[in-house]
């Protein structure tokens, strides 16, 4: 994927492709995918402009999470959903939120990602969206 225009100008790395389940409004239509990616503004510490708003370190050299939408499996046609700012930023620590991985099965959708914490650690965290909730959201 090409680098982004703003917060992800230094790096864009797709970490996961989640095919949208064929449920609800997506049951009969063309299918698509959500691509999760890690982006970074810079891969080194940036000196901030003293007249600009100070930002946490995570906005300069740690990866934050973004998303794209792609029709079918045509990853080359993917369009950014997080054009001017990341979609996934931890409310804790440096804001780091990266390395998304998903699994969709009959039980629903499982997602894991690395998330910055107040104590500076960055553990893997997980969420499960049950199948009935996936169907409700896509209907």
Feature locations, PLM:
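Short glycine-rich, acidic/polar surface loops and turns
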Residues: 97-100
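Beta-rich carbohydrate-recognition and catalytic domains
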Residues: 1-23, 27-94, 104-139
């Amino acid at each position: 994927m090409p680098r982004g225009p703003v917060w992800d100008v230094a790096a864009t790395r797709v970490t996961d492709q989640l095919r949208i389940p064929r449920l609800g409004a997506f049951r009969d239509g063309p299918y698509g995918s959500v691509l999760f990616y890690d982006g970074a503004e810079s891969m080194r510490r940036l000196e901030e402009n003293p007249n600009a708003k100070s930002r946490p370190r995570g906005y300069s050299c740690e990866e934050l999470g973004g998303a794209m939408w792609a029709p079918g499996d045509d990853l080359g046609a993917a369009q950014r959903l997080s054009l001017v700012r990341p979609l996934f930023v931890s409310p804790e620590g440096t804001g780091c939120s990266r390395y998304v991985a998903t699994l969709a099965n009959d039980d629903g959708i499982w997602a894991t990602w690395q998330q910055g914490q107040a104590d500076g650690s960055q553990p893997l965290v997980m969420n499960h969206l049950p199948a009935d909730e996936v169907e409700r959201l896509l209907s």
